[in-house]
Amino acid sequence: MRRERNFFTAMVLALVFSVVIGFAPTYYLRSSFPDAQEFAPPEAFFYAVHGAVNSAWVVLILVQTWLVRGRHVALHRKLGMFSMVVAIGVAVTGVYGALLAGSREGGFMAPPFAPEIFLLVPILDATFFALLIGGAIYCRRKPQAHKRLILLGTLSMCQAAMVRITPFGMASGPVMQLSLTLLFVIVLAVWDKRTTGRVHPVTLWVGFPLFLSEFLRFPVAMTETWQAIGRMLLQLV
């Protein structure tokens, strides 16, 4: 049990680290990166709130992990109710933030795609996060499934941070995102196999499909059907 608690604590810390590194230039260490993108009011205020809500989620799962590690299960469950509220905030601000970014003049700042095309990416990240965290809440009395769904849901939320980790220039962002996502799922699968003799169903049927979905997003986004939906959604803000 101690090894298991240490493992999941390390996995959460890895996700926290990716968020801090990815968003350091535009959020956490904004003053140290004068060339980073800026937003005009009221967008700036919204994205500050969005960043705070996402940061609160990351801090919460770290605290929750430490509570379980310290066997403070009762407090962990009480804090879980507040975590539900924060999770809703993450999903809602994620979707609205994507619509806001896509509807501005010039569309999304970095991706070289029309706004209605790229919109699918953050919309799916927020949707997967909501579904997986919802599944974790449903499975809260099944600890092994619960903790894996929390991790994988948070991994989905972290996609925007991972793509911003660009050690070899902007073009390396998607490669880093895919590599880190696959590495995370593989490490989880190896842990499952070594400790239980099999890959946990959540890891197998949620983790790997989550990674593979990355390769289906742009083929779907390039269809006329999605682009029509994307244009309709962007007109809402």
Write out the residue ranges for each language-model feature.
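Alpha-helical membrane insertion/targeting regions
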Residues: 1-237
